[in-house]
Amino acid sequence: MEMALMVAQTRKGKSVV
C-alpha cells in the first residue's frame, strides 16, 4: 500500500486503500 498515495487520495476526499 502506498502511504503517500493513500494520504494524497484521502486529502482530496477519496478513501482509496
From Swiss-Prot:
> Per its UniProt entry, which superkingdom is the organism in?
Eukaryota
Where would you find this protein in the cell? Cytoplasm; Nucleus
Record bears the keyword Metal-binding: no
Q: What is its main location?
A: cytoplasm
Key word Protein biosynthesis present: no
What does the record give under GO molecular function?
A: Hsp70 protein binding
Q: How does it assemble?
A: Interacts with molecular chaperone HSPA8/HSC70 (via N-terminal ATP-binding region); the interaction results in reduced ATPase activity of HSPA8, impaired interaction of HSPA8 with HSP90 and reduced lysosomal antigen trafficking.
- Please give the function described in this protein's UniProt entry: Negatively regulates MHC class II antigen presentation in dendritic cells by interacting with the molecular chaperone HSPA8 and impairing its role in lysosomal antigen transport. Does not regulate the levels or activity of the MIR155HG microRNA from which miPEP155 is derived.
Protein known as: HSPA8-interacting micropeptide miPEP155
Q: Which organism is it from?
A: Homo sapiens
**Gene name, Swiss-Prot/TrEMBL:** MIR155HG
